[in-house]
Amino acid sequence: MPGTLIIITAPSGAGKTTLVSGLLERDPQVNLSVSYTTREPRPGERDGREYHFVDVATFRALRDRGEFLEWAEVHGNYYATSKVWLKQQIATGRDILLEIDWQGAQQVRKSFPDAVGVFILPPSLEELEARLRGRGTDSDDVIMRRLLGARGEMRHVGEFDYVILNNDLQCALDDLVAVVRASRLRYANQHERHLQYFDFLEQD
């Protein structure tokens, strides 16, 4: 039985990384897809865990060989998803969580139309700016660029199946866990899990 692909998208600073970490702790059936990126690692990040950190030349070589399912440039850095790895994981029944931007989500859904799309919103742009400044890792120019990008990203919220407003971290995490559980109860998934039972029910 194939697994479920869950796409998580959010503007930088909306709390996506924290929510994803919480989901992985609460639901051991979910596995995180590790994307490729050319950005510098943040404090505490490790190559192969949060991302595969590569230089631009390596990224372009992988892209040109057709290794990526999708790729995008965000805030001057490249991000991409491994095509072969993702298809193998889904085929073997694993639920995979993919953290990508809205552009990447559009590309992925061409290959995985049944993927579940979740968009995480900050409570306001003012709160988003406060969170970005609270990180203490970005310059004012980078923060302003991220805020401008966030407004553009949030215009695509209507392209997603579920929207979570991250005003309270625990409530937002509960919502995300509920979305993942609900995705497993869709007809197509339940039919695959209980094929004989459903075939019996659908007999004339």
UniProtKB/Swiss-Prot annotation:
Primary location: cytoplasm
Keywords, comma-separated and alphabetical: ATP-binding, Cytoplasm, Kinase, Nucleotide-binding, Transferase
Binding-site positions, ATP: A10, P11, S12, G13, A14, G15, K16, T17
Catalytic activity: GMP + ATP = GDP + ADP
MF terms in GO: ATP binding; guanylate kinase activity
One cellular-component annotation, GO: cytosol
Domain of life: Bacteria
Domain Guanylate kinase-like positions: 3-181
InterPro entries, per the entry: GK/Ca_channel_bsu (IPR008145), Guanylate_kin-like_dom (IPR008144), Guanylate_kinase (IPR017665), Guanylate_kinase_CS (IPR020590), P-loop_NTPase (IPR027417)
Cysteine pairings via disulfide bonds: none
Classification via Pfam families: Guanylate_kin
This enzyme's EC code(s): 2.7.4.8
Compartment annotation: Cytoplasm
Leading EC class: transferase
Family as reported in the entry's similarity comment: Belongs to the guanylate kinase family.
Record's function text: Essential for recycling GMP and indirectly, cGMP.
Protein name: Guanylate kinase
Source species: Aromatoleum aromaticum (strain DSM 19018 / LMG 30748 / EbN1)
Biological classification of the source: Bacteria, Pseudomonadati, Pseudomonadota, Betaproteobacteria, Rhodocyclales
Gene name for this UniProt entry: gmk
